Amino acid sequence: MYYLRGWKQLIDRVVVFTGSKRDFEQYLENNLPEDEITIPFMELIQHYNARLRPNESGVGEAALQKNLYVDNCIVGADDYGSVMPHVLSNFVNIVTLNYQIGVLYVQNPPRRVLESLQSALDGDIEYKGSSYVELTRTVLKTIYQNLDNDVLGQDQCKKQILSGMYRLTTGTHGKPVVLMLYGPSGVGKTESAKSISKSLGGDLLRIQFSMMQTEEAFNYVFGSEHSKSSLARDMVGRESNVILIDEFDKVNPAFYNAFYELF
């Protein structure tokens, strides 16, 4: 295949970043020199589409055949949903068809994209990612202080939340802690989750299950087309290790088994 013949000459480095959009953008800001040529992945795809249909693009075929050099190409997590499935399966071929790239930055690649990269590079890939706050007794104290400032009342509930989270400080618990917050509207359930998430370094990942009453819920939880949103994609892109599944009781009970396995 084409990339196996000249891959090392076409892309100097590949960096796979796993984590949130915020952290990915911060990583790029710290690592991309301002004087270098950087293009987004979708600009590369536009060039690829023009080469497939030169008569429609209005660009001369000779110009389309030239290999262009760029210092950096950035593939964001949202880009995969904007291309056809064959682009993911032939990712390396398509990326290198018209471009010679210094550094290819890839955020949260789908399995097919990662396999394409690993096959071409024989595992020679740099892996970076978001780092999450480790829960310690000191962090628990900070969480409690912030909860006390952000949520009025509910003193007993706050203590129960901290008690439930304490076992994560021992380092012996392999699964996430699941806390059920229940009560009428306006008592601080969502605000408590938001406060904890901010104390742990980022915005809350909130999954609104009351909006999922049809096949949409099944596709979101178990996965569907790459262009559709999914629980797995949202979890990989989270900013903190706090996930709020809001109005869990309003989803079809058939989905409960999936979460019993997960948690």
Stretch-by-stretch model annotation:
Residues 111-148:
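Conserved ASCE P-loop NTPase core motifs with emphasis on AAA+ ATPases
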